[in-house]
Each structure stands twice: as structure tokens, then as C-alpha cells.
Curated annotation (Swiss-Prot):
SUPFAM superfamilies in alphabetical order: Multidrug resistance efflux transporter EmrE
Domain of life: Eukaryota
Membrane topology per record: Multi-pass membrane protein
Main location, first listed in the record: membrane
Similarity-based family: Belongs to the nucleotide-sugar transporter family. UDP-galactose:UMP antiporter (TC 2.A.7.11) subfamily.
Organism in which the protein naturally occurs: Arabidopsis thaliana (Mouse-ear cress)
Gene behind the chain: UTR5
Subcellular location: Membrane
Matching Pfam families: UAA (PF08449)
Biological function: Sugar transporter involved in the transport of nucleotide-sugars from cytoplasm into the Golgi and/or the endoplasmic reticulum.
Keyword line: Antiport, Membrane, Sugar transport, Transmembrane, Transmembrane helix, Transport
Any one GO CC term of the record: membrane
TM spans (from-to): 17-37, 57-77, 116-136, 143-163, 177-197, 218-238, 247-267, 293-313
UniProt xrefs under InterPro entries: SCL35B1-4/HUT1
Protein known as: UDP-galactose/UDP-glucose transporter 5
Amino acid sequence: MAEPDSVNEAKEKKKKLWKAVFAISGIMLTLVIYGLLQEKIMRVPYGLKKEYFKHSLFLVFCNRLTTSAVSAAALLASKKVLDPVAPVYKYCLISVTNILTTTCQYEALKYVSFPVQTLAKCAKMIPVMVWGTLIMQKKYRGFDYLVAFLVTLGCSVFILFPAGDDISPYNKGRENTVWGVSLMVGYLGFDGFTSTFQDKLFKGYNMEIHNQIFYTTICSSILSFTGLILQGHLLPAVDFVSRHRDCLFDIALLSTVATASQFFISYTIRTFGALTFAAIMTTRQLASIMLSCIWFSHPLSWEQCIGSVIVFGSLYAKTFVKKKSEKPPAAQELPRDEEAQPLKGNP
């Protein structure tokens, strides 16, 4: 009996290994491509006239429309009803804050580089903790506050001490331009609320993940489309992509990888848990920063290198401490990274 048991155990380990390779490869590939495409679309000029794509809300519309179509197909394929589980206004509230989150994210890329933005996203721990306390009445450990402080400190160092040669194509100011930082602060605040309210919605209703994805993204599609019409940006955006087919291809690929990343994220969390996912996401962020620096020639100052070490060192420490903890209090865990949320591909 011992030999068959050992054979079965070896097969299970091999099966789990291949699942891990599939999950890690999927997340790394889709979200790294997503990050690079974001920066390319918003910061690299198109055509002989060197025109910049400036309609960030159009990107939100394309992303959400693609995700809503795929989630609807997933619900129909699994023979689950499309009826809303929660009141529609709650889906709309998530949609509004998510649109504001994503718009701030794309707009910020006009003034700060992708490495700055990616590292700044790590500072979302503080707004998430604030919203978690206000909305969910959560209580956090002293270690959580320490990690949040260190991550914010590292992000501040990274933003305040840019390399002198990395200048925004939209503005002659440095990366610590007031407008760029203000957009990132808006992103962090709106994203923290979105993540916390999504968490409350999942716990308050017996809800399938695809149900929430479908209704929030369909609301986001309608709202972003309305915003494009009211601002008069829909026709200029369509005209731009019709003149620059490479931009249209980039936007289509961005929407595709953003949607695909959600399925890899859901699969990873369901198969390996949130802690393993957190470690993968931290590694993905580090890889994205390094690739962006190489691909788009972003110089890093030595202060920024120190800030990066502080941020990623703190995040890895947080993951390993929680993994070793025998009694991880679920109520004290911070919500997942923004890409873990159903609406984020945003990555």
C-alpha cells in the first residue's frame, strides 16, 4: 500500500506544480503586458506627426465593455441566471468609483512614469485600512500599520527623488509634478473605497464573482460611454484610432489581457489562496517596473532604488509573516491588490 500512496502523492505534487506554473505564467504574462501597453498608449506618440492618445475614458469604456461581454458569456455557459443579486444602485456605486479610479490611473501616466505609478499603487494600504475601518469596522494589527508606514515611506522616497532625465512627454515638470501626484492620490482614495465596498458586497450577498463582474462592468460601460458623449471625446477617440491602426490594436490587446488576467487571478486565489497570490503580485509589480525601465529607458536614481527595496521588502515580509502565522485573523487581512479585484486588470 505504501508504494501506491507514494506514487499518488508524487502525481499530486506534479499536478500541483503544473497548476502553479499555469497560474504564475498567466498572471505574469497578462499583467506585465497590460502595464507596458498602458504606458505605451498614454505616453508614446503615434504616427508621423507624433500624436498622443489623450482619451483615457475611452480606454475605460473598451476595457469594461470587453469584460462585461466575457462575464456574460461565462454566466450563460455555466447556465447561471443573469439577474442581479444586489440592488442595482450598489453595482452602480462600485462602477462610478471604479471609473474614477481607472481614469485617474490612465491620466496620471501623462505626468508620471509607469514605474512611479506602479510603486505608488503599493501605498494603497493606508486608504484601504481607513475605508475598512469606516465601512467594515475592521481592526488591524500593529504589524499592518508598520508595513503600511514603510511602504508609504518607500513610495514617497521613490516619487520625491526622481532621476533627472526622466521627464513627462506632456509636461516639462519632473515626475513629482503636483498634478501627477494629485491624480495618484485620487486613484488611491477611490481604489481603496472600491475594494472595500466590493468586499462588503460579497459578504452581504451570496454572490457569484461573474455576477458582480457583469453588472459592475456593464454599468461602467454605460457610464463611461455617457461621459465620452458629454465631454465630446467619443468621436475624437474613434477618429484617432481610425487614423492610427496600431493604437487600435494596442487598445484591443489591452482590453483582452485585462479581461484574461481576471480569470488567472480568480483561478490562482481559488487554487492556492490569497497569500500565494500576494507574493505573485508583488513579484509581478517588481518585474513590471524593471521591464518598463528597460523598454522605455526610464533612469532610476539611487534614492529610487532604496525606495523600491523598502517597498518590496516590506510587502514580502508581510506575506511571509502571514504565511507563518498559525491563526491568521480573516477580519484583519487587508483586501487583495487592485488586480485581484474583479474590476481590475488594472491592472
